[in-house]
């Protein structure tokens, strides 16, 4: 699991954690033979991500937004932890992610998308890629939360939806937590587009130092 930092001037990996499945952590002899410390316990990928984010934030790494794919966005504990630190995020979730919309009743992300009128969609670029601008149709709708204090109400919860322009009309879904003053559609689209930075980093690391062949050890 890798943590990638993306800024205006570029991006770089700044931390990593080795994911070990339970078939490994539950087999002490296997771990001993591989040189894995006895104290190593099983941790999910979102839990490893939290450890890295906590290290980065606690050491003062400037962080405007956190973004990641469905593996991390689908973990509510990670999302709630980020909220507890008032750390804005745009995290991908699955189409069947249950969300509070228009009240304290769960609605699937794809059902929310189906309910939005045509005027809710706007064509925007999620940054330029190798083949030009990454154009998609995007919709943004607020999610419901019980917010009592003025401090809680400073932040909003939203569902950002991306729809492809081809015949497949494929959708992607993002749960957003952000200050209401910063939650413009274009800003959130830009953050969602930053997730490609980690894929760019992987390709560069594979070509330059054989990351896919573990030549960096």
Which residues fall in each region the model found?
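Short, conserved catalytic/metal-binding motifs centered on acidic residues
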Residues: 1-3, 66-72, 89, 174, ...
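A general structural motif
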Residues: 9-11, 61-63, 86
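Short, well-ordered secondary-structure "scaffold" segments embedded in the functional core
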Residues: 66, 71-77, 182-184
């Amino acid at each position: 699991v890798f943590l990638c930092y993306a800024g205006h001037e570029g991006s770089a990996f700044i931390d990593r954690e080795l994911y070990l499945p339970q078939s490994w952590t539950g087999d002490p002899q296997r771990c001993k033979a591989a040189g894995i410390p006895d104290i190593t316990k099983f941790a999910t990928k979102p839990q490893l991500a939290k450890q890295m984010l906590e290290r980065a934030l606690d050491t003062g790494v400037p962080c405007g937004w956190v973004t990641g794919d469905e593996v991390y966005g689908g973990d509510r504990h990670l999302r709630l932890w980020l909220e507890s630190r008032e750390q804005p995020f745009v995290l991908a979730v699955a189409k069947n992610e249950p969300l509070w919309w228009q009240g304290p009743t769960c609605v699937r992300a794809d059902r929310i998308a189906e309910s939005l009128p045509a005027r809710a969609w706007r064509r925007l670029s999620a940054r330029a890629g190798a083949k030009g601008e990454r154009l998609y149709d995007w919709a943004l709708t607020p999610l419901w939360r019980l917010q009592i204090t003025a401090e809680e109400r400073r932040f909003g919860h939203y569902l950002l939806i991306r729809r492809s322009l081809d015949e497949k009309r494929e959708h992607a879904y993002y749960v957003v937590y952000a200050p209401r003053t910063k939650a413009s559609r274009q800003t959130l689209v830009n953050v969602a587009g930053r997730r490609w930075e980690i894929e760019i980093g992987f390709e560069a690391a594979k070509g330059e130092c054989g990351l896919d062949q573990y030549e960096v050890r």
